[in-house]
């Protein structure tokens, strides 16, 4: 219960408000029929999209309100919402590593100090900021996770920026990279951040 009330709900409220600020719908209205640029009619879904989106991303549950996994402009209208949603998926796993580092560090400190644990552990810590923030073990795990993320992001970005050779042979321009299956609004770079962190 404490995790829900002290971590998930506050992050969900803040993240949901940020998504609403950027244009993600948050209402209880029904679907709206709009006229498109081509003159056709289109049904646009509405509802509590922002609240469900941020909960989906914090819990890495997948799916989505519309079922397109944040690939629609309704669930993900701007680059800022894209970054909010991507980083919210990395928030809790990163916090777990920090928590682990702090828990292990405190136990190690108490084991070394014995009965004088309070005086030794609560004294002024002369270690670096990262060692104090993550703990020694947490810093190592977080660095390993970060290195794997950067390597994966680099490989994905390089591969996708090369374009599709089959489409190049067909005479299609590949100057923007491989845009097949990518969100045109965000391009290759923003799309690859989403792929690399999963």
Language model region names:
Residues 1-195:
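Membrane-proximal intracellular helices of multi-pass ion channels
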Residues 198:
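Calmodulin-binding IQ motif helices
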């Amino acid at each position: 219960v404490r995790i829900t009330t002290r971590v998930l709900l506050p992050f969900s409220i803040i993240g949901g408000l940020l998504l609403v600020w950027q244009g993600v719908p948050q209402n209880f209205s029904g679907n709206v029929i709009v006229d498109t640029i081509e003159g056709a009619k289109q049904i646009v879904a509405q509802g509590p999209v922002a609240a469900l989106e941020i909960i989906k991303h914090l819990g890495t549950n997948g799916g989505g309100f519309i079922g397109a996994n944040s690939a629609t402009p309704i669930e993900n209208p701007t680059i800022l919402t894209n970054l909010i949603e991507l980083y919210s998926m990395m928030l809790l796993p990163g916090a777990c590593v920090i928590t682990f580092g702090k828990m292990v560090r405190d136990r190690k400190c108490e084991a070394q100090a014995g009965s004088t644990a309070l005086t030794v552990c609560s004294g002024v810590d002369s270690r670096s900021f990262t060692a104090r923030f993550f703990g020694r073990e947490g810093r190592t795990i977080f660095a390993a996770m970060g290195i794997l993320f950067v390597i994966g992001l680099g490989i994905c970005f390089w591969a996708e920026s090369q374009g599709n050779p089959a489409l190049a042979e067909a005479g299609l321009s590949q100057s923007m990279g491989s845009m097949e299956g990518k969100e045109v609004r965000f391009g290759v770079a923003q799309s690859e951040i989403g792929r690399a962190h999963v």
